[in-house]
Amino acid sequence: MLVSNKTFVVIDIQNDITKHYRDIIDNINAAIEWAVTEGMHIVYIKHNNITAGTRTLKPGTKGEELVPEMKVVSDNIFVKTKSNALTSEAFSAFIAANGINEFYVAGADATGCVKSTCFNMTKAGYTVHVLSDCVTSYDLKKVPEMLVYWL
C-alpha cells in the first residue's frame, strides 16, 4: 500500500476525446512511469456523458474507454459526469482515505475538465501541478493561454 500524499491524475484520455491526445500520449506515459518511480498514487478519471441526445463518452461504449495507447498501471479509475473531477464521490473518497494533498495533472480538455478540476482542487486547498507537455485541447490555439493561467 502506498503512503504517498501525492497523486498523478490523468483526466479524460478516452477514445471519444480529441484526436490531439496522440500528440501527448508518449509524454503522459513517461509521466506515469515517473510518478510510479516517485511512489505516487496513479489515478485515471473518465468522463461519462449522461445528457440525453449526446453521442460521445456514453457509458458502456467504446468511446468512453481509456485510450489503448495509455499505460494503465492501477485500478484507480473514477468516473465523473461533470467537468470537475472532484464531483466524483468515489474520487473524493479516495483522496480523503489516502490523505492526498498534492496533485500532478495531465489530460484533456485543457480549457474544460482539466481547467475546472485544477481550479477546484486549488480552491479546496490542494497543491496542484499541471504538466504542460501532458495536456491538450480540442482547440490547440487555447493551450498556451491555459498554461499561462496555471503557471
Residue ranges of model-derived segments:
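Active-site loop/turn elements of alpha/beta-hydrolase fold enzymes
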Residues: H47-N49, D133
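A short alpha/beta connector and helix-capping loop motif
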Residues: Y21-A35, G39-H47
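Short acidic, Gly/Ser-rich segments with clustered Asp/Glu that frequently serve as metal-coordination loops
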Residues: Q14-H20
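Short glycine-enriched, charge-decorated loop/helix-capping segments at active-site entrances
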Residues: R22-I25, G53-P59
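Active-site-adjacent betaalpha module
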Residues: M1-T7, A30-E38, R55-L151
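Flexible, glycine-rich phosphate/dinucleotide-binding loops
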Residues: I17, T51, S137
